[in-house]
Amino acid sequence: MYVGPDIVTDGLIFGIDAGSSRCFTSGDTTATDLVQGFNCSGANGNPMSGTHTPNTANFPVYNATKGGVFDFAGGKGINVDGDLGNLTTSSMSMWLYRAPGATQYVTDGRNDSGQWFLSNYTSFNLNWHNTLRYNFEDPYNVSAPEFINKWVHMTITSDSTGSKVYINGVYAAATNESSADEDFGVNFRIGTRYTTSSQWTGKMGSIYFYDKALSAAEALQNYNAQKSRFL
């Protein structure tokens, strides 16, 4: 298990990290949320806000690189089997390793009133329901080396004042930056569409969700907390 400096815990409502044996180990087909104890299973079908029936074969596998990460090779997806709440302010802070390719989901909350978050979609490397759109290069490059086959720390936030993205702990000016729908809700998806398609094929490290908009200092704190592990 990797142990590093503290991440931000104020407002933390969800956290998974394959570097923690309390969350996930080699051979597991589910992971355990380290904050509220929610089960996280292989995404299957389109459960909306009802009961999710997991597909164990669709859960990412354990990869020992970087102290332990979730490996989505071949296309995998996670369903959070619990209710993360309907919010008016939220943040997602995570380590991503994007494999080459066209559109893939980072997250999707549309099973229960949330919004999609896509990569390499409509000529943007990161696109949070068109409310926030960001490119690592200008013009858009689907194979941008700053994003593809490279570990990147990303924090996105939204509240009534708008949305922001931080890349490797630094604020990055994005297109639009209007407020998103901050709901996570029931059966929130990581790495797949709410109907289980266009799945992530790279890797993901630690993944943290908050019921607040992280500040610039807090986004930097989360990056610094584990940069020696991933970079």
PLM feature spans:
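Extracellular glycan-recognition modules
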Residues: 26, 31, 35-44, 51, ...
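Short strand-turn-strand beta-turns centered on an Asx-Gly dipeptide
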Residues: 137, 166-169
